[in-house]
């Protein structure tokens, strides 16, 4: 089970309301919570807009009360994965739109109660780079996890529309993912464990947030059999069953960045013909410093198990894929398409030995990140155009 200790600094949290009717001191308690919230906001390095948005979210959340199955009206399905279905719902008592993840588990009541208890840690995970949490409950054989609704969906969904995501956009994504991982590690001593495009959510305000991180060891254990797809983003050390740390999340981020850059899951690597089809021009062997001829063993016959590219080979079996991740050279970005800074950044994430792989601190000070932090990028505008969303009347140029 994932070990958790008390955060070094007080976690940013506001106590969820309990549906027992108003008490004489509820107004005073609410004001005390708000003062406490403002103090904790000051501890995080946020700009004014981020502070206002977090404060608004937590103030709304305090009015939600106890979550019950009968209080939700289903609007539409948002997606499925990790053993659950995510739907867009309206919480009738508050009028709030939420994303509700339903996970069906055949488990004993004691295990179920432990999962719900462990998920309560999410109430304390409040950051501009972490999807907001309203609460979790059990009903009719299913655990419900209610979260902030992100109208841009996940980056794997965005990729289907965009085909490829531009480097300057991925610069902003990289900043948000690194800051989200650093927040989870520094404030809560937890690692994500499941970084991949479908767990990076975006919205029309230009915000980029992580979801589905491993706060509940019992839930992870109970869902172990449904993690086959997720294993394709796991680091070599994790696939081999050895000790792993937040360095494993960095591998997963690097692999995700290559996928979002070329438009398909990058293992096995695309050959020159496929790269030419992807980028619309001839490529010389495609991958910098890693010609296919020096691969230690012949390239497996299968194509990626999923993706949006033009590879027509039969799908790669999962055991072939996992063997490839452990024993073959890591993926790289194609030469001549991306900046050297971005290529180096990804290469540092995808070093197979975790002791040599870059850590969060090194990556945050990398030239690619420093450049992306000062670059003016209209992330919200790009996303809204790509997904044909209505842009809010007061969008930000970047939310990171």
Swiss-Prot record:
Residues annotated as domain Protein kinase: 72-369
Disordered as annotated region, ranges: 288-309
Recorded name of the encoding gene: MAP2K2
Signal peptide limits: none
Modified residues (Phosphoserine): 23, 222, 226, 293, 295, 306
Entry annotated with the keyword ATP-binding: yes
Site (Cleavage): 10-11
UniProt-recorded name of the protein: Dual specificity mitogen-activated protein kinase kinase 2
EC number(s) per entry: 2.7.12.2
């Amino acid at each position: 089970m994932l070990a958790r200790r008390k955060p070094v600094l007080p976690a940013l949290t506001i106590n969820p309301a309990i549906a027992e009717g108003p008490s004489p001191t509820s107004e005073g308690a609410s004001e005390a919570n708000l003062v406490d919230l403002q103090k904790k906001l000051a501890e995080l390095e946020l700009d004014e807009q981020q502070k206002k948005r977090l404060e608004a979210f937590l103030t709304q959340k305090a009015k939600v009360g106890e979550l019950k199955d009968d209080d939700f009206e289903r609007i539409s399905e948002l997606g499925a994965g990790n053993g659950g279905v995510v739907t867009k719902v309206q919480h009738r008592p508050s009028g709030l739109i939420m994303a509700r993840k339903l996970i069906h588990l055949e488990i004993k009541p004691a295990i179920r109660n432990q999962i719900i208890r462990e998920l309560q840690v999410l109430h304390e995970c409040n950051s501009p780079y972490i999807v907001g949490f309203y609460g979790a409950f059990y009903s009719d054989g299913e655990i419900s996890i209610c979260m902030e609704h992100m109208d841009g969906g996940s980056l794997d969904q965005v990729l289907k529309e965009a085909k490829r995501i531009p480097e300057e956009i991925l610069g902003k994504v990289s900043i948000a993912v690194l800051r989200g991982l650093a927040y989870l590690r520094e404030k809560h001593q937890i690692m994500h464990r499941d970084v991949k495009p479908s767990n990076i959510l975006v919205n029309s305000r230009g915000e980029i947030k992580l979801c589905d991180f491993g706060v509940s060891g019992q839930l992870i254990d109970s869902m172990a059999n449904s993690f086959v797809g997720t294993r394709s983003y796991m680091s070599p050390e994790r696939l081999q069953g050895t000790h792993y740390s937040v360095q494993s999340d960095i591998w997963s981020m690097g692999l995700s960045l290559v996928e979002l850059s070329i438009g398909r899951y990058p293992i096995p690597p695309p050959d020159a013909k496929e790269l030419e089809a992807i980028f619309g021009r001839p490529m010389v062997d495609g991958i910098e410093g890693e010609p296919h001829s020096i691969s230690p063993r012949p390239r497996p016959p299968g194509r990626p198990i999923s993706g949006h590219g033009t590879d027509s080979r039969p799908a790669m079996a999962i055991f072939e894929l996992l063997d490839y991740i452990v024993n073959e050279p890591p993926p790289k970005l194609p030469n001549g398409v991306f900046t050297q800074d971005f290529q180096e950044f990804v290469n540092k994430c995808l070093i197979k030995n975790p002791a040599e792989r870059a850590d969060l601190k090194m990556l945050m000070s990398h030239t690619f990140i420093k450049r992306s932090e000062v670059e003016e990028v209209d992330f919200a505008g790009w996303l809204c155009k790509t997904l044909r969303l209505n842009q809010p009347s007061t969008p930000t140029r970047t939310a990171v």
